[in-house]
Amino acid sequence: MAKVESQAGELQEKLIAVNRVSKTVKGGRIMSFTALTVVGDGNGRVGYGYGKAREVPAAIQKAMEQAKRNLNKVELNNGTLHHPVRGVHSGSTVFMKPASQGTGIIAGGAMRAVLEVAGIHNVLAKTYGSTNPINVVRATVDALVQGQSPAQIAAKRGLRVEEILG
């Protein structure tokens, strides 16, 4: 599952998966490791990283550095989403919709780790298709970035926020 570490920079780091991979060469197999991590500030910023190295700690370090470089802003509404969102990457499709206070994170595996570090506390989520952690994480971040606040939608349409909210 996911391991959690806190850092002085107030970023939450989670390790989602470590895999052993091999490259076959004339002399045999060369083993290396890959690591998938997510990083977030718990307040609407989230990023993911994928690192590969000959040793596990080096792969994790590379993944963490990449995740910190690739932070995305997510629009939150009191610990949940503003509206339902859908994200797709490769064979994975994720669907998330806002939930009322006290619901918690109803999501599994890699998606749960992304939502926790992003600062989302109440959400209903489902993964369709492939549950490969890399594709699920990328689809989840894609969906979260698509989310827009009522103020952003109003500005895009040239209306007032009250008109958008009905």
From Swiss-Prot:
Keywords: Ribonucleoprotein, Ribosomal protein, RNA-binding, rRNA-binding. InterPro entries: Ribosomal_Su5_D2-typ_SF (IPR020568), Ribosomal_uS5 (IPR000851), Ribosomal_uS5_bac-type (IPR005712), Ribosomal_uS5_C (IPR005324), Ribosomal_uS5_N (IPR013810), Ribosomal_uS5_N_CS (IPR018192), Ribsml_uS5_D2-typ_fold_subgr (IPR014721). One of its GO terms (molecular function) is rRNA binding. One of its GO terms (cellular component) is small ribosomal subunit. Residues 11-74 form the S5 DRBM domain. Belongs to the universal ribosomal protein uS5 family. Part of the 30S ribosomal subunit. Contacts proteins S4 and S8. NCBIfam families: rpsE_bact (TIGR01021). This is Small ribosomal subunit protein uS5. It comes from Aeromonas hydrophila subsp. hydrophila (strain ATCC 7966 / DSM 30187 / BCRC 13018 / CCUG 14551 / JCM 1027 / KCTC 2358 / NCIMB 9240 / NCTC 8049).
